[in-house]
Amino acid sequence: MRVLLIAGGVSPEHEVSLLSAEGVLRHIPFPTDLAVIAQDGRWLLGEKALTALEAKAAPEGEHPFPPPLSWERYDVVFPLLHGRFGEDGTVQGFLELLGKPYVGAGVAASALCMDKDLSKRVLAQAGVPVVPWVAVRKGEPPVVPFDPPFFVKPANTGSSVGISRVERFQDLEAALALAFRYDEKAVVEKALSPVRELEVGVLGNVFGEASPVGEVRYEAPFYDYETKYTPGRAELLIPAPLDPGTQETVQELALKAYKVLGVRGMARVDFFLAEGELYLNELNTIPGFTPTSMYPRLFEAGGVAYPELLRRLVELALT
């Protein structure tokens, strides 16, 4: 069994992807090669990829797409790319054309989960509770049917990139301008308060298994990029201090959403708990694997060690 790990990418989450790849390479129980997509879209292979990993940045690559790889050498490809042009079905589509098994969700599920607006529409139709939201496209006047505070987010980014908390309607225009730097579509979501943020991991194909539920606590106004990836900025409680009934409901809703959206392999499913009501926030089909990432820590708390988790993900790609 030989694995090709693809990391980096052209999205704003380039550095996070490299941090995740470092952890995976350290723990994966199979011979694994690394390919890095630089921020200019070109690829780095071999020692140059490892050098980029060590530097946690690859502004310029060497090989244009498609890279000169001997794809037949690899049994499974592990795309560890966060954000657009990696987590949104694009790389998955390329691997489908190659006929290579790969870790994680397929083309349609990846694209659907990446789009916060479309995924909420599907989940709401299926009876999964979601926070009130409205989509706004670049160039159209925003019509927000609820009062502030609310969050403005690019529809197709992760890691809290481009997100603003808006307290007054007069600040909406600036928040949308920031979101439109990253996407042509934004979502405006009602802010819940007081709120607890819960996360659960799912592992499996169609009928997944859920990890214990974790909780994220922090002092920042919201769970932004710096809070997520700076050690000590957030407290991760695993398991979350919840009554058994609430924990079971979180797990059941996560598994339902996983099936409804057609996800396979893995996902981290994020929830809000406000005034006793649960709301599904989003599914991340390529969750972080950094030292502070919740997904591997949740499964470790459930008795699945990091190397075993990676082994199962690779094996799921072949089934």
UniProtKB/Swiss-Prot annotation:
Family classification: Belongs to the D-alanine--D-alanine ligase family.
Gene3D superfamilies on file: 3.40.50.20, ATP-grasp fold, A domain, ATP-grasp fold, B domain
Protein name stated in the entry: D-alanine--D-alanine ligase
Catalysed reactions listed for this entry: 2 D-alanine + ATP = D-alanyl-D-alanine + ADP + phosphate + H(+)
Top-level class of the enzyme under EC nomenclature: ligase
Native species: Thermus thermophilus (strain ATCC 27634 / DSM 579 / HB8)
GO annotations of cellular component type: cytosol
Subcellular location per the Swiss-Prot or TrEMBL entry: Cytoplasm
